[in-house]
Design a protein with these regions (language model features):
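Alpha-helical membrane-anchoring segments
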Residues: 1-189
Length: 189
């Protein structure tokens, strides 16, 4: 039986879930070094100043709009890290995935000055991943759900959009510009 080229292997989705969660944990770790400077009232963009710009914040929401005290921001970061660990281990991955998406979007909206395209890409992967069955392999499950799935491939629109997202990101690979940019970034050229 021929497989459709848009079908995703469920084992690779499980590994994708783990890798995305590890990326989130590394991101949380590095953001925590500058937590006070970037996300609190003692930093360069206090919440009251940011909210006073309605042309920027009128359509945005953020969990970090609840307050900007260092204690509250630290608690929110710890909750975010807890959901990322849950996503990595596969403990209620759908809930953890959506909560990680909400927290990352909240960070993005709280201080857009430090956001980059990697944040947008991670948001998109989390969004599409939450519609995929990425908990079928390599996930902590209850005793009643220990049997391995019979089918190891999954085909859906969310999977197709995930594949297209990766394809569009790496569309410059055949042009040869990716290698040039990498060598330039490494200082070889």
């Amino acid at each position: 039986m021929a497989r459709n080229w848009l079908a995703l292997d469920l084992r690779s989705l499980g590994l994708l879930r783990i890798c995305i969660a590890l990326c989130l944990l590394v991101d949380i770790f590095f953001r925590s070094f500058h937590l006070v400077a970037h996300y609190t009232s003692q930093g360069f963009l206090p919440l009251r100043n940011y909210i006073s710009l309605p042309h920027i914040t009128e359509r945005h929401w953020s969990l970090f709009f609840l307050g900007d005290s260092p204690f509250l921001v630290t608690v929110l970061f710890l909750i975010y890290a807890t959901f990322a660990i849950g996503l990595m281990l596969g403990i209620r991955p759908r809930l953890c995935g959506w909560m990680c998406w909400a927290f990352l979007l909240s960070l993005y909206h709280r201080n857009p000055n430090i956001a980059n395209s990697g944040d947008s890409y991670l948001l998109a992967i989390l969004f599409w991943g939450n519609f995929l069955p990425w908990s079928r392999f390599f996930a902590c499950r209850g005793k009643s759900d220990k049997a391995e799935p019979e089918e190891t491939y999954h085909q859906s629109m969310a999977g197709a959009f995930l594949i297209f997202q990766v394809m569009f990101l790496y569309r410059s690979y055949p042009k040869g510009t990716v290698l040039f940019l990498l060598l330039f970034w490494l200082g070889i050229l």
